[in-house]
């Protein structure tokens, strides 16, 4: 199959049910949604807001049409009752029945069109925003393994170090595949494997069940997860399989979320969430990427990532987000990487996220901080589109779960951080963090 950046879909086969939105609640929260749209600086903000402002009117029109349809049905049943009593009247009432049928079809068509527009509006909306989300600049929540100063050092650039140590081959990868692909070799490959093993072991010890998900999913699942990454030039960021409805996943979050699609999950009274950890290859087109970050491991088209995914009861999702964040902090602490935890601003949040934390590591060879993990609470944004529910213990009713995701280990960027922070120019050696040594046969240096 040919891989393209635009979906060309034939013979669609949908497995997801039509999303069910609480339209009345959305209408009540129009100011909050409008603020979310504006603060996220969405490319189509004006169009989405115009559609949102028509939502109340369209919803009221449907209620009025429903009354008209109900009245038509009453008239039809009355005539049919009279015909049932006296079948000789069928000719007398045939014109009236025909007129009522035409009125019914006309009103039903209007109602269907309005419902379609309402559904399109609801699907286009981003999540609302947690009140603690900053407006346009990240807030530093915490420092991890803090340094007194952050000095740039070209001698610690990961590309030069890894090429010299035969850990990385970019030229051959460029010939074989293209720019921003790479080979990890020898200790480079072993370092990736150690990071994966460490992250999986730590996640399992923290109650996450293991999963190896597919790296290709249906486009409808990608859309339902709200994952439509693009740069500010609106260039597409998803790889698709030509003439199919399939795409390569940009994160294991997508297939892990799909594991709960069209299901009622068992969340017992003493269980606030179900937790998964999955490892997969991830694919990013990175259209529009520029600069030196495209020449190393920081911004690549394909990479390995260990992902955390949780389904939570609504009342506990804020707590679960904090637990994911603390897990990520402990990983970075044990690796010894200097970093900062950020409460990310609204203009950095994807449509599904209600709140998001990032962890950025100091990378002296790059001369700046770089994101190595993120954690998001998506509340019911994804579950409504994926039809993932649980049964409320108190009411017995089916309710939508909240979904959360977080990076356990984004391999290439963590390798960048490790190499650039732990390379000693005086000895020419890279120190291996103690937590990884058991997965590298006790190796202390590269």
UniProtKB/Swiss-Prot annotation:
Give the EC number. 6.1.1.11
Localization in the cell = Mitochondrion matrix
Alphabetically ordered keywords of this record: Aminoacyl-tRNA synthetase, ATP-binding, Ligase, Mitochondrion, Nucleotide-binding, Protein biosynthesis
* Molecular function terms, GO-annotated: ATP binding; serine-tRNA ligase activity; tRNA binding
Which cellular components does GO assign to this protein? cytoplasm; cytosol; mitochondrial matrix; mitochondrion
Record-listed L-serine binding positions: 251-253, 307, 407
The primary site where this protein sits is mitochondrion
List, alphabetically, the Pfam families matched.
Answer: tRNA-synt_2b
EC class, as a word, reads ligase
Binding residue positions for ATP: 284-286, 300, 371-374
Its domain of life? Eukaryota
Q: Which InterPro entries match?
A: aa-tRNA-synt_IIb, aa-tRNA-synth_II, aa-tRNA-synth_II/BPL/LPL, Ser-tRNA-ligase_type_1, SerRS_core, tRNA-bd_arm
Under the heading PROSITE patterns, the entry gives: AA_TRNA_LIGASE_II
* Entry-linked Gene3D superfamilies: Bira Bifunctional Protein, Domain 2 (3.30.930.10)
Any GO BP:
mitochondrial seryl-tRNA aminoacylation
| Enzymatic reactions | tRNA(Ser) + L-serine + ATP = L-seryl-tRNA(Ser) + AMP + diphosphate + H(+)
Q: What else is known?
A: Present with 405 molecules/cell in log phase SD medium.
* Family per record: Belongs to the class-II aminoacyl-tRNA synthetase family. Type-1 seryl-tRNA synthetase subfamily.
- What job does the chain carry out? Catalyzes the attachment of serine to tRNA(Ser).
Quaternary state and interactors? Homodimer. The tRNA molecule binds across the dimer.
Tell what the record comments on domains. Answer: Consists of two distinct domains, a catalytic core and a N-terminal extension that is involved in tRNA binding.
User: What protein name is recorded for this chain?
Assistant: Serine--tRNA ligase, mitochondrial
* Species whose genome carries this gene: Saccharomyces cerevisiae (strain ATCC 204508 / S288c) (Baker's yeast)
Query: What does the record give as the organism's lineage?
Result: Eukaryota, Fungi, Dikarya, Ascomycota, Saccharomycotina
Underlying gene: DIA4
